[in-house]
Regions:
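A general beta-strand register signal
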Residues: 2-3
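M16 family metallopeptidases and their MPP-like homologs
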Residues: 10-12, 16-49, 55-104, 116-124, ...
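Peptidyl-prolyl cis-trans isomerase
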Residues: 106-107, 111-112, 162-164
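An aromatic/glycine/proline-enriched structural segment found at the starts
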Residues: 144, 148, 152, 176, ...
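Conserved, carboxylate-rich catalytic/transport cores that coordinate ions
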Residues: 171
Length: 440
């Protein structure tokens, strides 16, 4: 159902326990951040409950607590989610708090300064953690200067530059009723849920037209690179191998989902089997790709001793090749379908899980009903289709490798695999551009 101001509402009764969840999905994810102000979308979401036109942060917290309600907010790449869970009897009262937050978050300076310090302190820790840093570098290398390549959590420099006015401007620009979607589920009748959405958000209007999201947030596919971030003090190395993948609405999505489950889904994936079970090179090795409105990245990752980083990178490349060349058999795919379908079904059982799945689908341009088709879609994928998706997309020759660790312990062996290695010091690393600030 669509409200008069353009808000799309999806309501489903997913249980009998009288607790419900309302998720409000607005545009303006991290892909709308400029590099100079990376982190604006995340700050705008996280700090939205720190004061509105009518309530202080303390009043908001006390009100939600008195109603038995919990509120979370997060900015993904493609949009921002607010999720409110409360007893049905208190749902309207809690929803009034949420409505005030979405419409009129004020971002008090003191709260911004406190969150900024906490976030910058956290980033300093992450920049010394090989696993955290490798993930940031891989994202930047895979997307270059395209919107998806922006650091969603910001950099120390960008967080220092964010002002209160930036956050208010972000809210006023991107949180727009005509582009907003509301999902309500749990122990609440759909008619009651839709009525609540109408009473809470139906009169929300904004004078300015709806903003236009970035047209091509993933940008062009980037050159294949082998990047080593040298961290001499690292006790171990983090290894990533990443390839360009597909948007959520691509017809090959379910084939790639199944192929990836064979490769690196959980402890029965091939990467775990080869790297952990057979060779004890790591405590775990996995692969995955996010659901995105534009091209995602499929990445394999593991942490290992510095001296075996090159060996893990080679296993990643070998397993990428094997996935696309060695035929997949139906029995193997059946086991993977069971694994994927089971975890998906468990997520759908809770109102928060249901809402997050449906909100994601809507954000990625698919209809909410797709949530109920997941197991069927996986069941329709043939071994040949899964193999073809792997061959086309999970190609070792197209894989960018990122290793963060003590380079001296693996660099010579890595050059035997990939001669064209870029070695960049971790100290003072600039994550605002794909050349790490080294050019120009």
């Amino acid at each position: 159902q669509t409200l008069s101001n353009g808000i799309e509402v999806v309501a489903a009764q997913t249980g009998d326990v009288p607790i419900a969840t309302m998720t409000v999905l607005v545009p303006g994810g991290a892909s709308t951040d400029s590099r100079e102000k990376a982190g604006v979308a995340q700050f705008a979401a996280q700090l939205a409950d720190q004061g509105t036109a009518d309530m202080s942060a303390q009043e908001i917290a006390a009100r939600l607590e008195s109603l038995g309600a919990s509120l979370s907010a997060n900015a993904g790449r493609d949009g921002t989610f607010f999720s409110l869970t409360a007893p049905v009897a208190n749902f309207e009262a809690a929803g009034e708090v949420l409505s005030g937050i979405v419409r009129s978050a004020q971002y008090p300076q003191a709260e911004l300064d406190r969150e900024r310090k906490r976030a910058i302190d956290g980033l300093l820790v992450e920049m010394k953690d090989p696993g955290e840093l490798a993930g940031k570098v891989a994202s930047l290398v895979m997307y270059g200067d395209a919107p998806y390549g922006s650091q969603s959590g910001g950099t120390s420099e960008s967080l220092a530059a964010i002002t209160r006015e930036d956050l208010i401007e972000h809210r006023q620009t991107w949180w727009h009723p005509s582009e907003t979607k509301i999902i309500v589920s749990g122990g609440i009748a759909p008619a009651q849920a839709t009525g609540l959405a109408q009473s809470l958000f139906g009169d929300w209007t904004v004078g300015a037209p709806a903003p236009t999201p970035p047209a091509d947030p993933a940008g062009d596919a980037q050159p294949v690179r082998t990047v080593v971030i040298d961290m001499p003090e690292a006790g171990q190395a983090a290894v990533y191998a990443a390839v360009r993948a597909i948007p959520r609405d691509d017809e090959r999505y379910y084939a790639l989902e199944l192929a990836n489950a064979v490769l690196g889904g959980g402890s029965s994936g091939r990467l775990f089997e080869e790297i952990r079970t057979k060779r004890s090179l790591s405590y775990g090795a996995y692969s995955g790709f996010a659901d995105r409105a534009d091209d995602a990245v499929l990445a394999a990752s593991a942490q290992t001793k510095n001296e075996t980083a090159d060996e893990v990178a080679q296993i990643f490349l070998d397993e990428f090749a094997r996935l696309g060349t060695e035929p997949l058999d139906e029995a193997l795919l059946d086991r993977r379908r069971l694994y994927l379908g089971g975890s998906y079904a468990r997520r759908l059982e809770s109102s928060s899980g249901f809402n997050s799945i449906v909100a994601g689908l809507m954000q990625q341009g698919l209809e909410p009903a797709e949530a109920a088709r997941y197991a069927d879609r996986l069941g329709q994928v043939t071994p040949r289709q899964a193999g073809a998706a792997a061959q086309e997309l999970v190609d070792p020759d197209k894989a960018t490798i990122v290793i963060v660790g003590h380079a001296a312990e693996f660099i010579d062996d890595l050059r035997a695999i990939r001669p064209d290695v870029e070695v960049i010091p971790a100290e003072g690393l600039d994550l605002s551009s794909a050349d790490f600030g080294l050019e120009g």
